[in-house]
């Protein structure tokens, strides 16, 4: 017990937020000046300790919980990938060093938070064979 592997970097510093965006954009192969974080001012980076066998599951659950909590508060949010690649690079390793974070952490995802410019669209219909009932 007590072996929760995830940590969260709550990034509100605009300079670091923009650096994360640029690194993410490069990994994505997107055109210059494209913002993978859709202009969101707050980025919660979820990472998990590789020493724990369930670290990817643990980090994914944190991401889902962050997104559900944000939605319940009326805060727009989106899961942005490529945290793994960011934090395997020298760029990410330097962030760990600057923060004094030791250990081997894998980037799970970015939870970008902000307020939507327009209301959310109606959800698409769900696939029919999503749940199988066993009675």
Where is each model-derived feature located?
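Acidic, surface-exposed loops and disordered segments
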Residues: 1-135
């Amino acid at each position: 017990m007590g072996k929760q592997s995830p940590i969260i970097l709550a990034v509100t510093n605009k300079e670091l937020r923009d650096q994360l965006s640029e690194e993410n954009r490069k990994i994505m192969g997107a055109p210059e000046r494209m913002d993978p974080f859709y202009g969101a001012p707050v980025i919660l980076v979820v990472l998990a300790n590789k020493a724990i066998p369930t670290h990817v599951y643990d980090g994914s659950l944190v991401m889902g919980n962050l997104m559900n909590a944000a939605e319940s508060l009326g805060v727009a949010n989106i899961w942005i990938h490529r945290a793994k690649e960011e934090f395997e690079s020298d760029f990410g390793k330097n962030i760990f060093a600057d923060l004094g974070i030791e250990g081997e952490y894998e980037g799970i995802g970015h939870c970008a938070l902000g307020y939507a410019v327009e209301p959310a669209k109606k959800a698409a219909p769900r696939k029919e064979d999503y749940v199988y009932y066993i009675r």
